[in-house]
């Protein structure tokens, strides 16, 4: 695998049985990762990673504490994309800042059965196409691909500024009993809260 040599960094899997328990990436390709079949049990930080990931068939049981399937910008020749055309994919995410299916570009789902459990089931920076198949997010069937990038909650607003100042004191009493025309001080302005997006 060499990131500066486009013909390299491809992974193609046509079938087989795979069981992995690793600390980093289970299946990693710099350019294209294509899987046409097989049985996969993967426990990893990122179970499947590449620039363009295409899954046509297979059975996947993925457990991850970072990204279950991650399309990242590893090659300049492809737009980061997760394309799923078939298969049965079960993804279980650990708690924390994790994503079931994460794409720095697009997600295309044309078929298959996908079940994702976790705080963030899908996260993508580009567009999502749901043309066929079945998707479950935390046990609930959905009719469109959610996006954690668009659904994050904003943080709490900032505290207001100081309260207004006290009014000014009146002028000194003049001889003859009348009080001078000292003007009250203007009240101070309250500061505006700051909304922080989460």
Model-derived regions, located:
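A composition-driven surface/loop motif
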Residues: 1-198
């Amino acid at each position: 695998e060499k990131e500066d040599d486009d013909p390299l960094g491809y992974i193609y899997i046509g079938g087989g049985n795979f069981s992995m328990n690793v600390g980093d990436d289970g299946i990693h390709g710099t350019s294209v990762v294509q899987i046409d079949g097989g049985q996969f049990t993967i426990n990893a930080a990122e179970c499947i990673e590449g620039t363009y990931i295409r899954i046509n068939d297979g059975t996947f049981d993925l457990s991850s504490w970072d990204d279950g399937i991650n399309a990242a910008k590893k090659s300049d020749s492809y737009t980061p994309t997760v394309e799923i055309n078939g298969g049965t994919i079960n993804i279980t995410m650990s708690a924390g800042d994790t994503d079931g299916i994460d794409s720095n570009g697009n997600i295309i789902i044309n078929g298959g059965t996908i079940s994702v459990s976790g705080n963030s089931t899908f996260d993508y920076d580009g567009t999502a196409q749901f043309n066929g198949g079945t998707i479950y997010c935390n046990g609930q069937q959905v009719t469109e691909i959610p996006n954690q990038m668009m659904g994050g909650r904003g943080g709490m607003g900032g505290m207001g500024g100081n309260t207004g100042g006290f009014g000014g004191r009146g002028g000194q009493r003049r001889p003859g009993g009348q009080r001078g025309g000292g003007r009250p001080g203007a009240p101070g302005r309250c500061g505006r809260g700051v909304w922080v997006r989460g």
